[in-house]
Regions:
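Short small-residue beta-strand/loop micro-motif enriched in glycine and branched aliphatics
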Residues: 3, 112-116, 362
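N-terminal topogenic membrane-targeting module
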Residues: 46-141, 339, 343
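Short loop/turn segments at secondary-structure transitions that flank enzyme active sites
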Residues: 111, 152-154, 188-192
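Membrane-proximal, solvent-exposed terminal domains/tails of membrane-associated proteins
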Residues: 168-467
């Protein structure tokens, strides 16, 4: 019964007040005198009671709207146009998304930032505070709004199935995505921003100049507050990260090419959103001056979605949620920016520790055979493409790694070399500590699930290095 709510609306109250007297008078001189008050009572209940946020008429309207559009393809955004501010080199791509003009800011992850999971909550200093974003909008462009969009995955399906299953068991329900990127989409509604845009130029040209200048200023202010933000010259990376392979909208899910993507409302925040098992996760938090933030979550799974605790599907509005037209009221959050990374150990209090490797090139010095085995297994499950030397062929076949002249893990935007490599930062992993350019020595305890032992036995007897 938690889905049932009472919701008062002035418009509905006026309609009931207007129609109630005729209903009562209609049956007054019949033997069904009770029918008039009964109809009024039913109308009052229908006007007050909502189910999952909609009244009965709202559900009927949503159903017929879904019938009309369910087989239509998605409307593609317009081709991006790059506009420049008065400062040469500050280029910002803008495009139309429906009736709204949008620009993109990419938030750059802070390298070598560990994430510690304490009682199901992720602790990291690589975050963007939605309160700060609302403050910047209020000061510099109060008639604009911004969406903080994160996309990524907890584990990847590119490695051997046994390796992925083993890593999923090791991380459990930790809100620790192996890969995640974050953008801010600045949105300009021509109706709301008409006055500010008109000061710069007439029509669309003024709106473009206003959006470009505002986006540049927000990125600069975020950087001054310790959040590395870069204006996007294109939407290519964002589009690739948020593509779900849309084919057809169903009532409570979206059919993709080889998967199902479901839009949910889940007010629990990023710790809840990123703990849900899924092949791909997209989160969106909308921030606007003077109003509470709004959010929605999209989870992609290979099979039809099942009921999730704490998540409510957006019934009859999956396409609208995908296109950022349906969001639910939320609260301010500190949103993680980059990847949590790979599980490297735990603290003395047995809290898991994760370290990202997918944001900057590194040379990884692995302490012994067990650490080497664990890192290769977990990096493969996290989405890295592992390459090992020829004498590691039995181990590579077991893991699903490639054979090549140089041992490394290739991530989408970085490479981790398993050994010395000139010109890149060095990370040292031992069973009892982690050393990075940012942290000299972080003491840790090893996490060794039972299933990892059989992989270590496949290592060659001579030599314990990766090359």
């Amino acid at each position: 019964m938690k889905s049932l709510r009472l919701k008062f609306s002035t418009a509905y109250a006026l309609w009931v007040a207007v129609l109630a007297p005729p209903c009562i008078l209609l049956f007054l001189k019949t033997r069904y005198v009770w029918a008039g008050p009964a109809l009024v009572a039913v109308a009052v209940l229908l006007a007050l009671i909502t189910f999952r946020g909609r009244r009965l008429l709202g559900w009927v309207a949503a159903f017929f709207a879904w019938l009309v559009r369910r087989r239509r393809p998605l409307l593609a955004p317009s081709e991006p146009v790059v506009g420049a501010t008065v400062q040469p080199g500050d280029h910002v791509a803008v495009r139309w998304k429906g009736k709204v003009l949008v620009a993109v800011i990419e938030l750059i992850a802070r390298p070598f930032t560990p994430t510690v999971i304490v009682d199901g909550k992720a602790h990291t200093d690589d975050v963007v505070d939605t309160r700060l974003l609302e403050q910047l909008l209020s000061v510099h462009c109060p008639d604009l709004e911004a969406d903080v969009v994160s996309a990524g995955h907890r584990v990847a399906r590119t490695a051997a199935a046994d390796v992925v299953d083993l890593y999923e068991q090791a991380i459990g329900a930790d809100p620790a995505p192996a890969h995640r990127r974050t953008w801010i989409i600045v949105r300009a509604d021509p109706r709301r921003a008409r006055k500010s845009a008109g000061r710069r130029d007439a029509g669309v040209a003024g709106l473009v100049r206003y959006l470009v200048a505002s986006t540049t200023r927000i990125a600069d202010e975020l950087s001054r507050h310790g959040v590395d933000a870069v204006c996007g010259r294109s939407f290519d990376d964002f589009d690739r990260a948020t593509d779900i392979g849309f084919e057809r909208e169903k009532w409570s899910t979206i059919k993709g090419r080889n998967s199902f993507t479901t839009a949910y409302t889940a007010p629990g925040g990023p710790d809840v959103w990123w703990s849900a098992p899924a092949d791909h996760t997209i989160t969106r938090v909308r921030v606007a001056p003077g109003v509470a933030p709004e959010s929605t979550v999209l989870l992609t799974t290979p099979d039809k979605p099942k009921k999730r605790r704490g998540f409510a599907r957006v019934a009859g509005g999956q396409r609208a949620a995908l296109q950022a037209q349906i969001l639910v009221s939320d609260r301010h959050h500190q949103l993680p920016i980059g990847s949590a990374g790979v599980l490297v150990g735990e603290t003395a209090s047995h809290y898991p520790v994760y370290l990202p490797f997918d944001d900057v090139d590194t040379s990884v010095n692995l302490g012994d055979a067990r650490v080497f085995t664990q890192f290769v297994l977990r990096a493969a499950a996290a989405g890295g493409t592992v390459t090992l030397g020829p004498h590691f062929r039995p181990f590579a076949e077991l893991v699903g790694a490639h054979i090549g002249p140089e041992a490394k893990v290739a991530w989408p935007n970085a490479t981790s070399y398993l050994g010395r490599h000139p010109g890149v930062d060095r990370v040292t992993l031992r069973h009892n500590m982690v050393s990075t350019p940012r942290h000299r020595q972080l003491p840790i305890l090893p996490v060794s699930p039972p299933g990892e032992g059989r992989y270590e036995q496949a290592l060659p007897g001579a030599g314990r290095t990766a090359s």
